[in-house]
Amino acid sequence: MSEVKSRKKSGTKGAPAEPGKRNEGGKSPEARGGGGRGWADPRTGVSLLSLGTCLGLAWFVFQQSEKFAKVENQYQLLKMETSEFQGLQSKISLISEKCQKSEAIIEQLKAFQIITHLKHLQEEIYEVKTWSSRISEKQDILNNNLTTVSQDVAKADQSTTSMAKDIGLKITTIKTDIRRMSGLVTDVTSLTDSVQELENKIEKVEKNTVKNIGDLLSSSIDRTAMLRKTASENSQRINSVKKILSELQGDFNKHTDRLLSLESDRAKVLKTVTFANDLKPKVYNLKKDFSRLEPLVNDLTLRIGRLVTDLQQREKEIAFLKEKISNLTTVRAEIKDMKDEIKHISDMD
């Protein structure tokens, strides 16, 4: 518009400067002025057209910028969705790894065959309980035998005091009998040593059970075999004790018969009486040792019961693990369904 105005001004200024040309053309200045206005009108039209095109272009650029902003927002949203989808994929991969690990653990548990081992262990524990009950019954029988032996010793004491005059003629036989009695005393001491060894073995077994309770499932068969061996050894020792007691009873009967025939040398008889009195505390100590054995056997049975309860708890834990694994399989199926839905949505987009 400014160019058009400047051109109009230049046209008006140039009109009086050329009078000769006016006369030559034969036209009036009014006609000339009309021609200048006609020359300026197309320029204004062109400028208006250019102005309209500029406005159209500006409007087009504005619309394009709005569309570009919308596209950029959609791109940011897509970026967020892809990051969330990647996080979901990582979580799904972690869950699938956990499922694979749990399946491997289940296969390992199946390979170990824990249930069969547990059944074998329960059967062997029942057998050990029966062995312990038999041992307790044999101990009761031994206690009764010991009471009868003590009563026989008391009767022997009374008979020795009444028959003190009959010993003078058979001192040599008494010496040999005393030697035999000393041999029996050594047998009794060896028996006490064996009982002590048995107690030490029981303590060792207890320590081993406390230390190796984690490896109980793998080494239960060997331990039950060792327990059977020790129980059989105990029964053999009890049988040997019974034999020794029967021999003692036979020797006591022989001595009572011989003491009835002895009638002299009262001092030596008193020595034999003191020897019999020395035997009494040893027999009493034997009773004490057997009474100490009873609580140990009871403690063993209690510990076996605790082992049974621990095994039942482990069975419950295994059942709980199975439930968890079934839940994991259902979760895995749901995750697969989610993956399929996400793939379907991505295909739709």
UniProtKB/Swiss-Prot annotation:
- Is Transmembrane a UniProt keyword of this protein? yes
Q: What is its main location?
A: endoplasmic reticulum
Cited PANTHER family? INHIBITOR OF NUCLEAR FACTOR KAPPA-B KINASE-INTERACTING PROTEIN
Specify the protein's topology with respect to the membrane: Single-pass membrane protein
Q: Where in the cell is it found?
A: Endoplasmic reticulum membrane
Q: What is this protein called?
A: Inhibitor of nuclear factor kappa-B kinase-interacting protein
Comp. bias (Basic and acidic residues): 19-30
Q: Which InterPro entries match?
A: Inh_kappa-B_kinase-int
Q: Where is the composition biased (Basic residues)?
A: 1-11
Give the positions annotated as glycosylation sites. 145, 327
PTM (free text): N-glycosylated.
Domain of life (superkingdom) = Eukaryota
Show the stretches that span the lipid bilayer.
45-61
**Keywords, comma-separated and alphabetical:** Coiled coil, Endoplasmic reticulum, Glycoprotein, Membrane, Transmembrane, Transmembrane helix
Region feature Disordered, mapped onto this chain:
1-39
Tell me what else is known: Shares a common promoter with APAF1 from which the 2 genes are transcribed in opposite directions.
Q: What does this protein do?
A: Target of p53/TP53 with pro-apoptotic function.
**What's an example GO cellular component term for this entry?**
endoplasmic reticulum membrane
Give start-end ranges for the coiled-coil region(s): 183-216, 304-347
